């Protein structure tokens, strides 16, 4: 039987997303999520050949138990024998990795070195790699690391450097790395297709908006700047992350309010963003649904700050492109694909650039539907394109390991 399928693993600190894909057609044979690791109610849910299912993994279960369940309970002998390689999503590759690579000892060491920049994600990725080696020994030489930071490695020095003592970059690697690169790469290819141009002639501003969010600007198919920084904390307002703040706020919280560094980190990473602004939830839908409700001013407050910050980044990146033609402003991710309200608020800030929203088109482009959302006489096109990070991981893995 032909080994033409790819098993995709996206290991988080307390969850594991998985899928089995055909890299040529994008046909999804299996997808699912194992979650609540190390808790009493660790569980797994899946969709196999169109049929949904779920199960308990047992109290305290984690990556090992989840992968064992996938291999023994979900993968039939026929499906298992069709898997030719395993693709791992890796959040941070530092400067070492500029593209996807077959995993060996040196790659593992590189992922370990980048733990300092992704302390929650990279250790989980390493567990996933170790468990994949154990459970699928016949595919040990066919594991591929696909890095979220790789797409952004084409940024010029003026974009990735911070105005800190230069030795902090040279000696410690402190610079902008970005994230969501796999999504930004996929959307770049889709904008090129929409524009009828080769990727290496495509210019775009891509807004990946989900619980985490980032904007990137692409010139001739290559990223030249992005909003996330050394870590995914910088940039846009996010679900629970603050995004850009005055760094001196950290000193103030420490010196004046007596907060510990752990408390400050917890505040900026887990208690800010939409959650902090609403004081209710990190879910953007709450802010949308209650935007006009005068009794819930927190909803309007949160969505206005969110969309204003987004518009600032889009406008700045339009300026950076200069004389280069902008093929599209693209929205993707859970919020980018489904929130017509966020798109409307953000694009209305860009009227100076001649951006003109078409209200009906904007409302139609939701729930998996793509399309142009600007008017025919708009100076620039804005489009909605559902992302497909799993397909990019599958295709990169197939190129290197099949």
Swiss-Prot record:
Pathway: Metabolic intermediate biosynthesis; acetyl-CoA biosynthesis; acetyl-CoA from acetate: step 1/2. Its cofactor is Mg(2+); Mn(2+). Substrate binds at residue 89. One of its GO terms (biological process) is acetyl-CoA biosynthetic process. It holds the Pfam family Acetate_kinase. It is found in: Cytoplasm. GO terms for cellular component: cytosol. ATP binds at residues 17, 208-212, 283-285, 334-338. Gene3D superfamilies: 3.30.420.40. The keyword Magnesium applies. The keyword Kinase applies. InterPro entries: Ac/propionate_kinase, Aliphatic_acid_kin_short-chain, Aliphatic_acid_kinase_CS, ATPase_NBD. Mg(2+) binds at residues 10, 389. Mg(2+). Can also accept Mn(2+). It catalyses: acetate + ATP = acetyl phosphate + ADP. Keywords: ATP-binding, Cytoplasm, Kinase, Magnesium, Metal-binding, Nucleotide-binding, Transferase. Its main location: cytoplasm. The active site is at residue 148. It is an enzyme of class 2 (transferase). The record marks 180, 241 as: Transition state stabilizer. Its EC number is 2.7.2.1. Homodimer. Belongs to the acetokinase family. Catalyzes the formation of acetyl phosphate from acetate and ATP. Can also catalyze the reverse reaction. This is Acetate kinase.
